[in-house]
Swiss-Prot record:
Designated gene of the protein: pnp
Function: Involved in mRNA degradation. Catalyzes the phosphorolysis of single-stranded polyribonucleotides processively in the 3'- to 5'-direction.
Protein name, as recorded: Polyribonucleotide nucleotidyltransferase
Top class in the EC scheme: transferase
Organism of provenance: Pectobacterium carotovorum subsp. carotovorum (strain PC1)
Assembly description: Component of the RNA degradosome, which is a multiprotein complex involved in RNA processing and mRNA degradation.
Ranges where the KH domain occurs: 553-612
CDD domains per record: KH-I_PNPase, RNase_PH_PNPase_1, RNase_PH_PNPase_2, S1_PNPase
Start and end residues of each S1 motif domain: 622-690
Length: 706
C-alpha cells in the first residue's frame, strides 16, 4: 500500500511540505515539494554502474513546466508542451550548478534529475521549490552525494532583506538573488540588482545562506525517516606508481609549457607533452590504460598551475593576480547597424550590435502564469571558431542561453523606461574570440553598442570574472581569469555593474569552505577591475549619442481621445491598414489613446500624424469642407469629407434649382465643396453643396483625400 511520509515546516512567509513514498516508487527517489500551492514533483534515477570507458560525470537535470499546473492549455497547433522554453532551460541550469560539485570525484554513473511543475501559485516562483526538491530527492536516493543543499531567494525592499519575496514584492525589489549551499558553505549565487553596493550584495548572500538552514534540517529529518541505504560505492583505487611515473615525465615540461602566454601555442605544446608521455608509458607497458594516463596528466597540469599561483608567481599569461588583460574598445564598427561595438580583452573578443524596433517587435513570452512582453532582448552566440575549433552551428545551446541571460541581467538595471524611450531593443553578442569570461565581455560590448545606438542608458556598465585558488587556509583571488584558470580553479565569480553599484552577480564554487572574507576580497578586487574597464570604455564613448541612427525607425507619439480609437482603426482594421500603406509607416494604438508612429523617414511620419489628426478631428456644423463623391444614389450622393467620415448630400441640396437626376450634376470621384448642415445623435452627417457654393461662404476646408 502507499505509505506517504511527510515533513512540513515554515520557510519565511511560506509553508513548505516535503512528501515521499506516494508516487514514482520505481525511481531511485521521488519527492513532491509544495510551497503555498506551488508544487514541483522531483525524481532522481541513478545507474548502479558506470558505462565502460566513461570519462566524465553524466548528470542531466530537466526542469519542465506543465500548463495544467496553472489551469491552462498549451499554445501552438498541437496543444501540447514541446521543447524546453528559455525559462525552463535557465532553471535547469540553476538546479544543476549547486548539486554538480557535491558528487564525489571519480563517480561516473549516469544520474538524471527531472523536476515537473504540477501546480503553481502565481505569487510563488517554482524555481526555489524545484531546487529544494532536487536536493531532497538526491539525499533520499542513497546515491553518493555530499548534500543536502538549501536554496533561497533574497529580495531587497525598503532597505531590508526579504526571504523568498512574492512575485508582487519582487516587482518592487531592488534585488533578485538566488543562493544555494550546504550547511557550511555557499555553492551558487545568481542575481540581478539595481546598483547595490558590494556590502549589500554580500549581506544578501549571507542572509540567504543563514535562512536556508531550516530547509537542510528538514531534509535531513526526512532522510532519517525515509532515506534509502547509502550505495556501497568506492572511488577507483589510485595507481600510485603510475601517478609518480607520469609526474616525473611531465611536471617540469608542463611547467615550461604554462609559461607560454599565447593560448593556441600553449595548447599545442601541452598536447605534444601529453602525447609524448602517453606514448613513452605505453611503450614500456602495453597493458596500461591510455584514459587513466590522460586523467593523471590532467591532475598534474592542474597542480602545476595552482601551485604557481599560490606561490605568488606570475599567472599563465605573465600577469599578477589583480591585473586586467589589455583592452581595445571600438564603437560604430558596422555601418548599417543601429549601434555596434567591438570589445577586446586579451584573447576574448565580442562583436556586439544594438537594433531598435517598435512595440510590435517586442517578444511575447507565454509563461505558466500567462503572457508577458519583453522589450529588451539580449542574445549571445558562441560559434566554434571563437576557440579555434570546428563544430555544429544551429539553435542556441544551454550554455549560450545562460550566458545571454547573465549578460542581460548585467545591463537591465540601466535600461531606460518605456515612457522615456518607447523602443524595443535587441542586443546580439557574437563571441569572435574566447579565452575566459566572454559573458562579461558581452556586458561591456552591450553597454558600448547601446550608447552608440543612442539608447539613453543611465550609466555605462562593465563586467569582470574573478577566480580563486585555495589550498587549506592559503588562497589567492584572481582578476579577469583565463579559460584555463576557470577550469583549474575553485571558483567562478562574475560581477557586472556601473560606477554606482552592482547590477549582476553570478558565483559558482567547486569546493567547500569559501568564507565571507574570501567573498569580500573577491568583490572588492572586482570593483577595482570594473572601474578600470569603465575608464577605458569611457575614452571610446562616455555618454549615449545625442540622436539615434539614421537607419533606425523614429517613433513619434501623439494622444487621441479614447472614443476616437475606433475611428482610426476602422471596421476590421481597414482604416489603420490603409493609413499604414498610404504613409509607409508603422502605427500602434494603445488603450489609453497613445498613438505611436514609427518611420525611418520624418516626412512620412508627419504625413501619418496629419492624417490621424484629420480622422480624429470633430466635424463642425456650419463649416465648409472639400469632399469627394463616393456613392451616387437616387435620392442624392454620399461625399467623403476626410478622416474616413462620410455624409449625405440630399438631391434637394445639390443645386439651387430642381434636380431630376443626380448624375446630371455629380460624378463618382468628383471633388465638391460641401457645408455641414447637421450631425444627428447617431453621428450621421447631413451636407449641402448649394449652401457651400453660395457667394457668401468662406473658402472650403481642404479635404484629407487630396
Amino acid at each position: 500500500m502507499l505509505n506517504p511520509i511527510v515533513r512540513k515546516f515554515q520557510y519565511g512567509q511560506h509553508t513548505v511540505t516535503l512528501e515521499t513514498g506516494m508516487m514514482a516508487r520505481q525511481a531511485t527517489a521521488a519527492v513532491m515539494v509544495s510551497m503555498d500551492d506551488t508544487a514541483v514533483f522531483v525524481t532522481v534515477v541513478g545507474a548502479k554502474n558506470a558505462k565502460p570507458g566513461q570519462s566524465f560525470f553524466p548528470l542531466t537535470v530537466n526542469y519542465q513546466e506543465r500548463t495544467y499546473a496553472a489551469g491552462r492549455f498549451p499554445g501552438g497547433f498541437f496543444r501540447r508542451e514541446g521543447r524546453p522554453s528559455e525559462g525552463e532551460t535557465l532553471i535547469s541550469r540553476l538546479i544543476d550548478r549547486p548539486i554538480r560539485p557535491l558528487f564525489p570525484e571519480g563517480f561516473l554513473n549516469e544520474v538524471q534529475v527531472i523536476a515537473t511543475v504540477v501546480s503553481v501559485n502565481p505569487q510563488v516562483n517554482p524555481d526555489i521549490v524545484a531546487m529544494i526538491g532536487a536536493s531532497a530527492a538526491l539525499s533520499l536516493s542513497g546515491i553518493p552525494f555530499s548534500g543536502p543543499i538549501g536554496a533561497a531567494r533574497v529580495g531587497y525592499l525598503n532597505d531590508q532583506y526579504v526571504l523568498n519575496p512574492t512575485t508582487d514584492e519582487l516587482k518592487e525589489s531592488r534585488l533578485d538573488l538566488v543562493v544555494a549551499g550546504t550547511e557550511g558553505a555557499v555553492l551558487m549565487v545568481e542575481s540581478e540588482a539595481d546598483l547595490l553596493s558590494e556590502d549589500q550584495m554580500l549581506g544578501a548572500v549571507v542572509f540567504g545562506h543563514d535562512q536556508q538552514q531550516v530547509v537542510i534540517e528538514n531534509i535531513n529529518a526526512l532522510v532519517a525517516e525515509a532515506g534509502k541505504p547509502k550505495w556501497d560505492w568506492h572511488a577507483p583505487e589510485v595507481n600510485v606508481s603510475l601517478e609518480q611515473r607520469v609526474q616525473a615525465l611531465s611536471e617540469a615540461r608542463l611547467g615550461d609549457a604554462y609559461r607560454i602566454t599565447e593560448k593556441q601555442e600553449r595548447y599545442a605544446q601541452v598536447d605534444v607533452i601529453k602525447a609524448d608521455v602517453e606514448a613513452a608509458l605505453l611503450a614500456e607497458d602495453e597493458t596500461l590504460n591510455a584514459g587513466e594516463i590522460q586523467e593523471i596528466l590532467g591532475n598534474v597540469e592542474k597542480n602545476v598551475v595552482r601551485s604557481r599561483v599560490l606561490a605568488g608567481e606570475p599567472r599563465i599569461d605573465g600577469r599578477e593576480k589583480d591585473m586586467i588583460r589589455g583592452l581595445d574598445v571600438r564603437t560604430g564598427v558596422l555601418p548599417r547597424t543601429h549601434g555596434s561595438a567591438l570589445f577586446t580583452r586579451g584573447e576574448t573578443q565580442a562583436l556586439v550590435t544594438a537594433t531598435l524596433g517598435t512595440e510590435r517587435d517586442a517578444q511575447t513570452i507565454d509563461e505558466l502564469t500567462g503572457e508577458r512582453t519583453d522589450r529588451f532582448l539580449l542574445h549571445y552566440n558562441f560559434p566554434p571558431y571563437s576557440v579555434g575549433e570546428t563544430g555544429m552551428v544551429g539553435s542556441p545551446k544551454r550554455r549560450e542561453i545562460g550566458h545571454g541571460r547573465l549578460a542581460k541581467r548585467g545591463v537591465l538595471a540601466v535600461m531606460p523606461k518605456a515612457s522615456e524611450f518607447p523602443y524595443t531593443v535587441r542586443v546580439v553578442s557574437e563571441i569572435t574570440e574566447s579565452n575566459g569570461s566572454s559573458s562579461m565581455a558581452s556586458v561591456c560590448g552591450a553597454s558600448l553598442a547601446l550608447m552608440d545606438a543612442g539608447v539613453p542608458i543611465k550609466s555605462a556598465v562593465a563586467g569582470i570574472a574573478m577566480g580563486l585558488v585555495k589550498e587549506g587556509d592559503n588562497f589567492v583571488v584572481l582578476s579577469d581569469i583565463l579559460g584555463d584558470e576557470d577550469h583549474l580553479g575553485d571558483m567562478d565569480f562574475k560581477v557586472a555593474g556601473s560606477r554606482e553599484g552592482i547590477t549582476a552577480l553570478q558565483m559558482d564554487i567547486k569546493i567547500e569552505g569559501i568564507t565571507r572574507e574570501i567573498m569580500q576580497v573577491a568583490l572588492n578586487q572586482a570593483k577595482g577591475a570594473r572601474l578600470h574597464i569603465l575608464g577605458v570604455m569611457e575614452q571610446a564613448i562616455s555618454t549615449p549619442r545625442g540622436d539615434i541612427s539614421e537607419f533606425a525607425p523614429r517613433i513619434h507619439t501623439i494622444k487621441i481621445s479614447t472614443d476616437k480609437i475606433k475611428d482610426v482603426i476602422g471596421k476590421g482594421g481597414s482604416v489603420i491598414r490603409a493609413l499604414t500603406e498610404e504613409t509607409g509607416t508603422t502605427i500602434e494604438i494603445e488603450d489609453d489613446g497613445t498613438v505611436k508612429i514609427a518611420s525611418t523617414d520624418g516626412e512620412k511620419a508627419k504625413h501619418a500624424i496629419r492624417r490621424i489628426e484629420e480622422i480624429t478631428a470633430e466635424i463642425e456644423v456650419g463649416r465648409v469642407y472639400q469632399g469627394k463623391v463616393t456613392r451616387i444614389v437616387d435620392f442624392g450622393a454620399f461625399v467623403a469629407i476626410g478622416g474616413g467620415k462620410e455624409g449625405l448630400v440630399h438631391i434637394s441640396q445639390i443645386a439651387d434649382k430642381r434636380v431630376e437626376k443626380v448624375t446630371d450634376y455629380l460624378q463618382m470621384g468628383q471633388e465638391v465643396p460641401v457645408k455641414v448642415l447637421e450631425v444627428d445623435r447617431q453621428g450621421r452627417v447631413r451636407l449641402s453643396i448649394k449652401e457651400a457654393t453660395a457667394p457668401t461662404q468662406e473658402a472650403a476646408a481642404p479635404s484629407s483625400e487630396e
